[in-house]
Curated annotation (Swiss-Prot):
It comes from Mycolicibacterium paratuberculosis (strain ATCC BAA-968 / K-10) (Mycobacterium paratuberculosis). It comes from the Bacteria. Residues 139-169, 193-207 have a biased composition (Pro residues). One of its GO terms (cellular component) is cytosol. One of its GO terms (molecular function) is GTP binding. This is Translation initiation factor IF-2. Residues 430-437 are annotated as: G1. Belongs to the TRAFAC class translation factor GTPase superfamily. Classic translation factor GTPase family. IF-2 subfamily. Keywords: Cytoplasm, GTP-binding, Initiation factor, Nucleotide-binding, Protein biosynthesis. Residues 57-68, 98-138 have a biased composition (Low complexity). Residues 236-296 have a biased composition (Gly residues). The lineage of its organism: Bacteria, Bacillati, Actinomycetota, Actinomycetes, Mycobacteriales.
C-alpha cells in the first residue's frame, strides 16, 4: 500500500487472521487496538517482512526458483559454458512476468562451483542484452588442476569435479522503493518476493547491495575481450561496476547486467585466491545498504593530519613515570613558586593534572591536584619528565611580583646629587639579661625594662635619640632586640635593618650562646660591631676576659691590633655612655656611607606590629629611603592600607617621616608581619592586588610546609593512632607570635606526638577562635592578650581550654610538658615470683585448680602470669584469678608455702611452672 493500511487489509493481503497480525504487531512493540486500526507505512513494511511477504510473494518467488533450478541442472548435465547466461535470462523473464517489480530470488549455488548473481531490478526501458561473450576460465583453487586455456580442448581429468559449497546464509536485503517512509513514490500493494539464502559470504571491499542509485538500468559494457567466467566460491553481493573492455562484472543496481565482455557469473575474489568472492575472513558479513540511499558499511577512515601524526609520535616518545605516560620535556626550565600544586605544574607543561597525581601515587607520594607540594617532590617529578624545575625563592618571587606592577624595592632613585646624609641605625644585641634594655633606658632617660613581663624584652622597639657630637646635634636611631633564645627571628630582622650593631656583654658573665648568635647575625648582615662590656661595677667583673673570649669569634680589640672598638660601660650607673655613643658615630663616619634620597616614594621595613583596641592595626615602621607622608597608599607583606596617622616614640603626631626615622603607622586593614617590607604605591587598588597575591602565596607555602609527607611504605605506621596537639596562638604583636610559634615548633619529643599550629593572629581571643578550637579540638594560647566579650563564656560552654602567658619561656615549658604527657606509656616488667604445680584438682564451680609450691619470690592475686613447661612458654598474659592458702582466700603467698590458684587456663600439667610478674609504668623522657 502506498500509505497507511488497516490491520484487516494487511491480514487479507498476507493471508492470515487479524488476531495473528495484532499479535505480531504487539511483538514488534506496536500496540494497536483493533483490526480496524491503521498503521503507518514503515510498520506495514516490517509486518510484511516478518510474515515473509504473503502468499502472493511466495507464488512469485517459486517460479523463478524452479526455472533457475532447471537451468542449473541443464548446465550441470551439458557442461555448456553459456548455461549461466541462459539460466539468468530465464530467471529475469520469470521475475518480470511475476510482476515483482523486477526482483527475483537468486538461484542456488551450482554444483560445479559456479555461482550466479541474484537478479537485479529491471525496468521496461532496459536495453537489450548483447550476446554472451566467450568466457575466460576461472582461476584454479589451491590444490586443483589448472583449467585449460580458451580455445584448447580440456585434458582428461583436468576438469574439477563438483564440490559442495559453503552453508547458505541469508543475503543482505537491498533497499526497495517503498522502504523510505519519507519518499513520495510508494508501491501500490505489490507482493514482495521472499529473499532466498545465497551461499558464501560477501567479499570485503566489494560494492554493497543497493549502492547503485534507485532503479537505474545497467549500463552496457564497452567492447572488449572475452569476459571472465565465474570462479568457485560465493557470489559477490550487490551490483558491480560496468564491464569495460575485457573487464570486470558490469551492471548497475542489484543486477549484474553485462555489456560486451562482462562476466556472466557473479564469482568474486581476486585471481589466485581460494574461495572466490567469499574470500574474506570466515563468518564475515557483508556491508548493508545505508538508510535512504546512503552507502552503507563502515565509514571510510580518512588520512591522518600532520598534527595527529605528531601527537601520536609524541605520545609514543613520552616518558612513562610510575606506569603513567607523561609529557616529555627538552630540558627547559620550569619556574614554580614555593608551595605550588600539581595543577600549577601541569599548567606550565600543558599536561593533565590527574596524570601527575597518578604518577606521584605510583612513585609512593599521595597528593591531590590542588594540594601544595614540597620542593623536592616537584624537582623529582620534573627530572623524570626531563624538565628542570626551579623553585623560586620568596625574595625572587616577590621581586617578580613588584616588577609586574612596575615597582622596585631596595634601590635609591635619582642621581648622586639627590642623596642626602641620614642618621645611623644602631641595633643593640646580646645575651638575655646582659643589660641591653637598661642601656637604652639610660640613653633615652626612660624606663622600658620595668614594663616588660619578667624583666626580659619580648618586643622589638625602635627609638631615635639626639646626641651632641663635636658641638653638633646628631640623631641616632636605636633598635632594641630581645636576647632570649626564642627570639632568633627578631634578632635576625634587627641585624638586617641596621647599620651598626652594639654587642652588649656582661663583664661578670662572659660570652653566652645568644652572644655568639648575635655575632653570627651581625657578621652575616655585614654590619660593623661595637662591643659594650657592661656591668663593670659588679663584683667579679673581668673586662679583659671578655676581650679574650671575643677574639675567638673574630672580634679583635683595637688595643690588640684589631679594628673592633670595645667600650667598658655600666648602664646602671651611666658610666662611659658618652664614649659608647661617640664610638658609634665614629664607626658610622669612618666605615659607612649613610645617604638616601628623601624625595622618592617611601620604602622601609615593619619592625613590629600589633593590634590596638582603639586604633586598630599599628605597625612600627623604619623608613629606609624616601619620605612617608600621611595619606600615602602603602602595602607591607599581605597587609595594605592608607596612612591615616603617624606617631613617634614619644606619642606625638608626625606628618612625614624621613629616612632612618622610626614611626608607628596607623591605617592598615590588617596586621602586617614583623619584618615585612613597606612600599608606597600610587593607588589603593595596586596595594590591594599586591597584598592579595602575597597572601595567596603565603597560604600555599604554609600548606606545603605543614603537610606531612606520607609515603606508601610509611602508610601503615601513619594510619596508626598518633597523638596531635592542636594550638591556636594569639599575641599582642606579630613578632611575638612569630617567635612563639617558631619556639613551639622546635620542640622535639617523639614521633608519636605532633604539634600543629592551626591558626595564629594578633589581638584578643575572639569567639571565632573559640569556635575553631572547638571544631578542631585545639588549645588556645594567649600571650599578653585576654579573651574578648563572650569568648570566655563560649569557651566554658564548649569545653575549650585557654591558657594565658606573659613570659614566653613559661609557655614553651608547659607545652613541652603537655606533649610529654601525651606520649603512650612504657610498661616495664617486674618479676614477682615462681610457683611449681604439684597437683591438679577439678571443681565443677571454679574449674581446674592448680596446687602449687612457691619456689621463689611472692605470688599475688590478680597479678599477671605465664605458664612454662620445660622452660618453654606455653601461655602468656594469664591472670591469677583466685589464690587460696588452705581454706582461706589470700592476696599473696610467699616463698616456701603451698597454695591453690586458678588461671582461667585448662591446659596445665603437673611439673609446670607459673611465673608471676607485674607491669610497672615508666615515665618517658
Amino acid at each position: 500500500m502506498a500509505g497507511k493500511a488497516r490491520v484487516h487489509e494487511l491480514a487479507k493481503e498476507l493471508g492470515v487472521t487479524s488476531k495473528e497480525v495484532l499479535a505480531r504487531l504487539n511483538e514488534q512493540g506496536e500496540f494497536v487496538k483493533s483490526a480496524s486500526s491503521t498503521v503507518e507505512a514503515p510498520v506495514a513494511r516490517r509486518l510484511r517482512e516478518s510474515f515473509g511477504g504473503g502468499k502472493a510473494a511466495e507464488g512469485a518467488a517459486k517460479a523463478p526458483a524452479k526455472a533457475a533450478a532447471k537451468g542449473d541442472a541443464k548446465t550441470a548435465a551439458k557442461g555448456d559454458v553459456k548455461a549461466p547466461d541462459k539460466a539468468l535470462d530465464a530467471a529475469l523473464d520469470n521475475a518480470i512476468k511475476a510482476g515483482g517489480n523486477g526482483e527475483a530470488a537468486a538461484p542456488p549455488a551450482q554444483p560445479g562451483g559456479t555461482a550466479t548473481t541474484p537478479a537485479a531490478q529491471a525496468t521496461p526501458e532496459a536495453p537489450a542484452r548483447p550476446g554472451p561473450a566467450a568466457a575466460r576460465p576461472s582461476a584454479p583453487a589451491p590444490g586443483q588442476p589448472k583449467p585449460p586455456a580458451p580455445g584448447q580442448p580440456p585434458r582428461p581429468g583436468a576438469t574439477p569435479g563438483p564440490r559442495p559449497g559453503p552453508a547458505p546464509k541469508p543475503a543482505a536485503r537491498t533497499p526497495r522503493v517503498g522502504n523510505n517512509p519519507f519518499s513520495s513514490a510508494q508501491p501500490v500493494d505489490r507482493p514482495i518476493p521472499r529473499p532466498v539464502p545465497r551461499p558464501g559470504a560477501p567479499r570485503p571491499g566489494a560494492p554493497r547491495p543497493g549502492a547503485s542509485p534507485g532503479n537505474m538500468p545497467p549500463r552496457p559494457g564497452g567492447v572488449g575481450g572475452p569476459g571472465r567466467p565465474a570462479r568457485p566460491g560465493a557470489p559477490r553481493p550487490g551490483g558491480g561496476r560496468p564491464g569495460g573492455p575485457g573487464g570486470r562484472d558490469g551492471g548497475g543496481g542489484n543486477y549484474r547486467g553485462g555489456g560486451v565482455g562482462a562476466s556472466p557469473g557473479g564469482g568474486g575474489g581476486f585471481r589466485g585466491r581460494p574461495g572466490g568472492g567469499g574470500g574474506g575472513r570466515p563468518g564475515q558479513r557483508g556491508g548493508a545498504a545505508g538508510a535512504f540511499g546512503r552507502p552503507g558499511g563502515a565509514p571510510r577512515r580518512g588520512r591522518k593530519s600532520k598534527r595527529q601524526k605528531r601527537q601520536e609520535y609524541d605520545s609514543m616518545q613520552a616518558p612513562v613515570v610510575g606506569g603513567v605516560r607523561l609529557p616529555h620535556g627538552n630540558g627547559e626550565t620550569i619556574r614554580l613558586a614555593r608551595g605550588a600544586s600539581l595543577s600549577d605544574f601541569a599548567e606550565k607543561i600543558d599536561a593533565n593534572p590527574a596524570s601527575l597525581v597518578q604518577a606521584l601515587f605510583n612513585l609512593g607520594e599521595m597528593v591531590t591536584a590542588t594540594q601544595s607540594v614540597g620542593d623536592e617532590t616537584l624537582e623529582l617529578l620534573g627530572s623524570e619528565m626531563n624538565y628542570n624545575v626551579q623553585v623560586v625563592s620568596p625574595e625572587d618571587e616577590d621581586r617578580e611580583l613588584l616588577e609586574s606592577f612596575d615597582l622596585t624595592y631596595g634601590e635609591d632613585e635619582g642621581t648622586e646629587e639627590d642623596l642626602q646624609t641620614r642618621p645611623p641605625v644602631v641595633t643593640v644585641m646580646g645575651h638575655v639579661d646582659h643589660g641591653k634594655t637598661r642601656l637604652l633606658d639610660t640613653i633615652r632617660k626612660a624606663n622600658v625594662r620595668e614594663a616588660e613581663a619578667g624583666g626580659i624584652t619580648q618586643h622589638i622597639g625602635a627609638y631615635q635619640v639626639t646626641v651632641e657630637h663635636d658641638g653638633v646635634e646628631r640623631p641616632i636611631t636605636f633598635i632594641d632586640t630581645p636576647g632570649h633564645e626564642a627570639f632568633t627571628a627578631m634578632r635576625a630582622r634587627g641585624a638586617k635593618a641596621t647599620d651598626i650593631a652594639i654587642l652588649v656583654v656582661a663583664a661578670d658573665d662572659g660570652v653566652m650562646p645568644q652572644t655568639v648568635e648575635a655575632i653570627n647575625h651581625a657578621q652575616a648582615a655585614d654590619v660593623p660591631i661595637v662591643v659594650a662590656v657592661n656591668k663593670i661595677d659588679v663584683e667579679g667583673a673581668d673586662p679583659q676576659k671578655i676581650r679574650g673570649q671575643l677574639t675567638e669569634y673574630g672580634l679583635v680589640p683595637e688595643e690588640f691590633g684589631g679594628d673592633t672598638m670595645f667600650v667598658d660601660i655600666s648602664a646602671k650607673q651611666g658610666t662611659n655612655i658618652d664614649q659608647l655613643l661617640e664610638a658609634v658615630l665614629l664607626t658610622a663616619d669612618a666605615a659607612l656611607d649613610l645617604r638616601a634620597n628623601p624625595d622618592m616614594e617611601a620604602q622601609g621595613v615593619a619592625i613590629e606590629a600589633h593590634l590596638d583596641r582603639g586604633r586598630g592595626p599599628v605597625a612600627t615602621v623604619l623608613i629606609q629611603r624616601g619620605t612617608l607622608r600621611v595619606g600615602d597608599s602603602i602595602v607591607a607583606g599581605d597587609a595594605y592600607g592608607r596612612v591615616r596617622r603617624m606617631v613617634d616614640e614619644h606619642g606625638d603626631d608626625v606628618e612625614e617621616a624621613l629616612p632612618s626615622r622610626p614611626v608607628q603607622v596607623i591605617g592598615f586593614t590588617s596586621v602586617p608581619g614583623a619584618g615585612d617590607n613597606l612600599l608606597v604605591v600610587d593607588e589603593d587598588r595596586i596595594a590591594r592586588q599586591i597584598a592579595d597575591k602575597r597572601s595567596a602565596r603565603k597560604r600555599n607555602a604554609l600548606a606545603a610546609r605543614s603537610r606531612k609527607r606520607i609515603s606508601l611504605e610509611d602508610l601503615d605506621s601513619a594510619l596508626k593512632e598518633t597523638s596531635q596537639l592542636n594550638l591556636i596562638l594569639k599575641g599582642d604583636n606579630a613578632g611575638t607570635v612569630e617567635a612563639l610559634e617558631e619556639a613551639l615548633m622546635g620542640i622535639q619529643i617523639d614521633d608519636e606526638v605532633a604539634l600543629r599550629v592551626i591558626d595564629r593572629g594578633v589581638g584578643g581571643i575572639t569567639e571565632t577562635n573559640v569556635n575553631l578550637a572547638s571544631a578542631s579540638d585545639a588549645v588556645i594560647i594567649g600571650f599578653n592578650v585576654r579573651a574578648e566579650g563572650k569568648a570566655t563564656e563560649l569557651a566554658n560552654r564548649e569545653g575549650v581550654e585557654i591558657r594565658y602567658y606573659s613570659v614566653i619561656y613559661q609557655a614553651i615549658d608547659e607545652i613541652e610538658k603537655a606533649l610529654r604527657g601525651m606520649l603512650k606509656p612504657i610498661y616495664e616488667e617486674n618479676q614477682l615470683g615462681r610457683a611449681e604445680i604439684r597437683a591438679i584438682f577439678r571443681s565443677s564451680k571454679v574449674g581446674i585448680i592448680a596446687g602449687c609450691m612457691i619456689t621463689s619470690g611472692v605470688v599475688r592475686r590478680n597479678a599477671k602470669a605465664r605458664l612454662l613447661r620445660d622452660n618453654v612458654v606455653v601461655s602468656e598474659n594469664l591472670t591469677i584469678n583466685s589464690l587460696r592458702r588452705e581454706k582461706d582466700d589470700v592476696t599473696e603467698v610467699r616463698e616456701g608455702f603451698e597454695c591453690g590458684m586458678t588461671l582461667g587456663y585448662s591446659d596445665i600439667k603437673e611439673g609446670d611452672v607459673i611465673e608471676s610478674y607485674e607491669l610497672v609504668q615508666k615515665e618517658r623522657t
